[in-house]
């Protein structure tokens, strides 16, 4: 599923997703609260059918009212109900002994990857409490007025570049991807994190509009908001890590296949694939969703496919619309112009958007000092884990925040994704001080070039070695 985590290990799993929200180990039925949710329906629906503890914490930083509201919807489920609602028939006998007893969250989640530390009611951590206090003191968490004006100008630029592209102008192949990145990708990323505005409808409209030519909203929510932001750099859980494997090995815990290929070939093949990431976001991810739906109908879907299909199905119509717009982008030039010009108008924007995404977005996480054994990372409070699995650079530069849509400060962004990237440069000095106070060593680079260089070094080492022990020996 777009993008699925590994689901071929462990015991048999439920094939029918449940409809509950699992937070801090407790089960909640928030169905009746969806329409009343202040953050909008899309935000709350991301957590349905899964353990959404990290999501719940990440988007509720301004006060603690959410904890009181949440308790109104706590439910106690008998294990028998969990079995009939959630598990395959061949699993019912495994929990029948508990019939009549309260089902724990692990049984309800079922398909969720095993959590390392036990979930407890509201995990408080001094580091995260200081982060929340910092955000509250800052005040405005949504897009700043200068960036709103800038993006209005970008709309004009996007329309102009699309007009040139429609006319077949050579220059449009360079200008269009620029506006797709600084405007559309920014709208999808910030809007998808509900960070543009306090009004859910504004976030929704901007996200879905920007996604028409950049990615599929439903698949993006699944891979990015849920799998990546909740499980950053955890192998088998982080959708970004697993979406590249086995074609690209980007973590020491991942296997290296095929073993008979020279490491230099693996390394350069990896870089070549960077040019096609945009196709994965716009076409392959949605198609994998439809494969999951088809597998469900045939009864062959495993639990992970079923869970992910349920999440993306909430945005089925937008997935269809986005496939139509992307299809039109790739087909129209070949109907209007000669083959070479059509190839230029389609492939060059694809390459530029792909490189922008892979270099700017992935360079922060695929770094040796940002990767550690998943079992060790899972022992940390999730906020500390976010700070230790991202590399930052040019953090106090508004220009670089603009050019990278805030992805130059991913450690802070991952802790408070609901804060607009336009606010991050002003927050970063206080964030750095908080990290120093709590003994968290930030992973910093001088600039993007420096970060990209250490990223390449990481890929080179990973192309030759297998384990953390071997990697450490190489770097010693």
From Swiss-Prot:
Catalysed reactions, semicolon-separated: a (9Z,12Z)-octadecadienoyl-containing glycerolipid + 2 Fe(II)-[cytochrome b5] + O2 + 2 H(+) = a (5Z,9Z,12Z)-octadecatrienoyl-containing glycerolipid + 2 Fe(III)-[cytochrome b5] + 2 H2O; (9Z,12Z,15Z)-octadecatrienoyl-containing glycerolipid + 2 Fe(II)-[cytochrome b5] + O2 + 2 H(+) = a (5Z,9Z,12Z,15Z)-octadecatetraenoyl-containing glycerolipid + 2 Fe(III)-[cytochrome b5] + 2 H2O
Pfam families reported in the protein's UniProt record: Cyt-b5 (PF00173), FA_desaturase (PF00487)
Main location: membrane
Residues holding heme: 37, 60
Intracellular or extracellular location(s): Membrane
Domain of life per record: Eukaryota
An example Gene Ontology CC term for this record: membrane
PROSITE patterns: CYTOCHROME_B5_1, CYTOCHROME_B5_2
Residue intervals passing through the bilayer: 146-166, 168-188, 267-287, 315-335, 343-363
Keyword Transmembrane helix in annotation: yes
Residue window of motif Histidine box-3: 410-414
The Cytochrome b5 heme-binding domain, residue ranges: 10-75
GO molecular function, a single term: metal ion binding
Keyword Iron applies: yes
Motif (Histidine box-2) on chain: 224-229
Motif interval(s): Histidine box-1: 189-193
Recorded metabolic or biological pathway in which this protein acts: Lipid metabolism; polyunsaturated fatty acid biosynthesis
Topology relative to the membrane: Multi-pass membrane protein
Alphabetically ordered keywords of this record: Fatty acid biosynthesis, Fatty acid metabolism, Heme, Iron, Lipid biosynthesis, Lipid metabolism, Membrane, Metal-binding, Oxidoreductase, Transmembrane, Transmembrane helix
A GO biological-process term: unsaturated fatty acid biosynthetic process
Function: Front-end desaturase having a omega-13 desaturase activity for omega-9 unsaturated C18/C20 fatty acids. Strong substrate preferences for linoleic acid and alpha-linolenic acid for the production of pinolenic and coniferonic acids respectively. No desaturase activity for dihomo gamma-linolenic acid and eicosatertraenoic acid.
Protein family membership: Belongs to the fatty acid desaturase type 1 family.
Domain remarks in the Swiss-Prot or TrEMBL record: The histidine box domains may contain the active site and/or be involved in metal ion binding.
Protein name: Acyl-lipid omega-13 desaturase
Taxonomic path: Eukaryota, Viridiplantae, Chlorophyta, core chlorophytes, Chlorophyceae
Gene: DES
């Amino acid at each position: 599923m777009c993008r699925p985590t590994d689901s071929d290990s462990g015991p048999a799993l439920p094939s029918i997703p449940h409809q509950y929200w699992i937070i801090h180990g407790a089960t909640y039925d928030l169905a009746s609260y969806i329409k009343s949710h202040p953050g909008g329906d899309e935000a709350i629906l991301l957590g349905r059918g899964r353990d959404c503890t990290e999501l719940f914490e990440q988007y509720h930083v301004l006060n603690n009212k959410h904890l009181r509201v949440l308790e109104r919807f706590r439910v106690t489920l008998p294990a028998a109900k969990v079995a009939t609602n959630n598990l395959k028939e061949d699993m019912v006998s495994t929990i029948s002994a508990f019939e009549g007893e309260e089902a724990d969250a692990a049984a309800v989640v079922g398909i969720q990857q095993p959590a390392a530390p036990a979930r407890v009611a509201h995990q408080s951590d001094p580091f995260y409490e200081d982060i929340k206090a910092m955000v509250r003191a800052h005040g405005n968490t949504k897009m700043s007025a200068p960036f709103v004006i800038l993006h209005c100008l970008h709309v004009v630029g996007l329309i102009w570049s699309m007009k040139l592209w429609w006319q077949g102008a050579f220059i449009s192949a360079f200008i269009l991807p620029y506006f797709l990145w600084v405007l559309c990708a920014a709208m999808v990323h910030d809007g998808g994190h509900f960070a543009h505005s306090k009004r859910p409808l504004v976030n929704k409209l901007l996200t879905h509009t920007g996604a028409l030519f950049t990615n599929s909203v439903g698949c993006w929510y699944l891979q990015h908001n849920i799998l990546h932001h909740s499980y950053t750099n955890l192998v088998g859980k982080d959708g970004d890590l697993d979406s590249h494997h086995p074609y690209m090995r980007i973590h020491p815990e991942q296997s290296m296949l095929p073993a008979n290929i020279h490491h230099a070939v693996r390394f350069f093949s990896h870089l070549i694939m960077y040019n096609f990431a945009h196709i994965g976001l716009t076409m392959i991810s949605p198609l994998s969703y439809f494969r999951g739906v088809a597998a469900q109908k045939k009864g062959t879907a495993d639990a992970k496919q079923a869970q992910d299909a349920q999440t993306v199905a909430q945005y089925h119509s937008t997935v269809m619309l986005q496939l139509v717009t992307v299809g039109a982008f790739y087909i129209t030039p070949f109907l209007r112009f000669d083959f070479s010009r059509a190839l230029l108008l389609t492939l060059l924007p694809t390459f530029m958007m792909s490189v922008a995404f892979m270099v700017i977005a992935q360079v922060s996480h695929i770094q040796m000092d940002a990767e550690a054994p998943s079992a060790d990372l899972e022992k940390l409070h999730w906020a500390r884990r976010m700070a230790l699995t991202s590399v930052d650079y040019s953090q106090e530069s508004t220009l670089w925040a603009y050019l990278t849509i805030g992805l130059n400060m991913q450690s802070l962004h991952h802790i408070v994704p609901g804060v607009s990237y336009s606010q991050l440069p002003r927050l970063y000095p206080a964030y750095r001080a908080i990290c120093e106070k709590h003994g968290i060593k930030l992973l910093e680079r001088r600039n993007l070039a420096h970060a990209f260089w250490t990223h390449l070094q990481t890929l080179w080492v990973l192309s030759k070695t297998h384990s953390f022990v071997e990697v450490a020996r190489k770097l010693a």
